[in-house]
Amino acid sequence: MNLKETELCLGLPGGTETVESPAKSGVGNKRGFSETVDLKLNLQSNKQGHVDLNTNGAPKEKTFLKDPSKPPAKAQVVGWPPVRNYRKNVMANQKSGEAEEAMSSGGGTVAFVKVSMDGAPYLRKVDLKMYTSYKDLSDALAKMFSSFTMGSYGAQGMIDFMNESKVMDLLNSSEYVPSYEDKDGDWMLVGDVPWPMFVESCKRLRIMKGSEAIGLAPRAMEKFKNRS
């Protein structure tokens, strides 16, 4: 008697289907499970590889940008350098260049000297470079000191020191006469030398009384003769 025929099994009455043995069914189950696991692993590895490709590119780009040996080219910022500072520098350079040209040519120098007058409680300062002759200087001093009047000069605006009588007449007729201190420290009468030489040698001016200036006349005439 076949024992398989008498075995109890689950199923519909009259069914002829046989149930596979647990060993056979287990082998099939294991094979199906391994296939599904391998498929999932393959899918995951493909996804990771795709992500790695994308993620590996980004750090390389960042490291390239952060590389100190190869800084990226920077475009000049609009409005740099500041316009105000740039203009100041340009103007300063222009002024310094103009000043150097003026000093080299000698036309931009100034010759400020102090002017005092006997009896006046104040001092003045004049720029001799602003005037072109003794006549211009005389008019300017007359405006500064109302009581000052300068005597008449020759055609060149100079006192005729060759004629002693004319010098004495000038000093006696004028209440005040201008005098100046030269580079040697001597006080001389204004008008003893040509105007350009006077501008270069004058250190300060003093308007003194004619009676006091008479003592300067012999010294001025002697120095004038030595220069001539």
Curated annotation (Swiss-Prot):
Single GO MF descriptor: transcription cis-regulatory region binding
PB1 domain location: 110-210
GO cellular component, one term: nucleus
Keywords: Auxin signaling pathway, Nucleus, Repressor, Transcription, Transcription regulation
Induction description: By auxin.
Principal place of residence: nucleus
One GO-annotated biological process of the protein: negative regulation of DNA-templated transcription
PROSITE patterns according to UniProt: PB1
Tissues where the protein occurs: Preferentially expressed in roots and flowers.
UniProt subcellular location: Nucleus
Motif (EAR-like (transcriptional repression)): 8-12
Swiss-Prot/TrEMBL domain comment: The N-terminal half of the protein contains two conserved domains I and II. Domain I includes a slightly degenerated ERF-associated amphiphilic repression (EAR) motif which seems to be involved in the activity of transcriptional repression. Domain II is required for the correct degradation of the protein through the SCF-mediated ubiquitin-proteasome pathway. Interactions between Aux/IAA proteins and auxin response factors (ARFs) occur through their C-terminal dimerization domains III and IV.
Family note: Belongs to the Aux/IAA family.
PANTHER family reported for this sequence: AUXIN-RESPONSIVE PROTEIN IAA14, AUXIN-RESPONSIVE PROTEIN IAA17
Function (record text): Aux/IAA proteins are short-lived transcriptional factors that function as repressors of early auxin response genes at low auxin concentrations. Repression is thought to result from the interaction with auxin response factors (ARFs), proteins that bind to the auxin-responsive promoter element (AuxRE). Formation of heterodimers with ARF proteins may alter their ability to modulate early auxin response genes expression.
Subunit text: Homodimers and heterodimers. Interacts with TPL.
Protein name (Swiss-Prot/TrEMBL): Auxin-responsive protein IAA14
Gene this protein is translated from: IAA14
